Amino acid sequence: MRPTALGFIGVALFATGLGSYFAFLPQSAGAVAFWVFAGGPALVLSAFAAAWASREELLREWFTPKWGDFTRGVVGTALLFCLAWAFVHLVAPIGSKREIWLVTLYGQIGDPHLLQAHAPAIAATIAAVATAEEIVWRGAVTSFLAERVGSRTAWAWAAGLYALSYVPTAWSLRAVGPEGGWNPMLPIAALGGGLVWGGMARVFGRLPPSIVAHALFDWAVIMMFPLWGVR
């Protein structure tokens, strides 16, 4: 693997981990800072990733649209949502000790009524960050890893690193009190999402289907069909 590729992966891990840690600290709950820390690193990294992909003549290949991309994205969203719903209801159901994982996570995102009042801005933010994350993780990072492990498994390795970048949130989202402790919800969600979106990028050879699936899933679990509480 080239030093520049290894360096980019390291920076992506560090920047995403640092941003996600601060995004999910209690003082960022429901504030603009949450969205800045959560999405800012991906937006910055995606600019460098896109510039590299353009020089390597990969950007056009990644974003060439094809008929049915949106439908593929919807199917991917439905699959991931079903997996997330099943996981939550099996591992952290309402009334269980692990419900606190979801309580702290959704509490961090903010007041549902305030989110609904700013729905267009939230939608634009989700779309931009989802696109940026796909460029970084399913695009650049996967391509860099393919140089080392081959294209057949690079997408799975990228999903693992994507999940690793969210491990710091296990500390920032930890709950206090007798039911407290580390909160693994986001690393688990990132692993599941990374595998689904990475698999889509691998199968279809492009990013639009995974971008649609990523953005729609985030919109669904935040704004339309939350996995905990009422939005």
Residue ranges and their predicted role:
Residues 2-57, 103-112, 120:
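Alpha-helical transmembrane segments in multi-pass membrane proteins
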Residues 3-11, 34-37, 68-76, 117-121, ...:
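Alpha-helical transmembrane segments of integral membrane proteins
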Residues 9-13, 42-43, 73-85, 122-126, ...:
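Alpha-helical transmembrane spans of integral membrane proteins, capturing the lipid-embedded, hydrophobic core
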Residues 10-27, 62-70, 97-106, 127-136, ...:
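Hydrophobic alpha-helical transmembrane segments
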Residues 19-28, 90-91, 168-175:
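Juxtamembrane "helix-exit" motif on the non-cytosolic side of transmembrane helices
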Residues 27-31, 58-68, 142-150, 201:
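Membrane-interface helix-boundary motifs at transmembrane edges
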Residues 31-32, 58-129, 178-182:
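Juxtamembrane helix-loop-helix connectors linking adjacent transmembrane helices
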Residues 116-231:
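Transmembrane helix-loop-helix hairpins at the membrane interface
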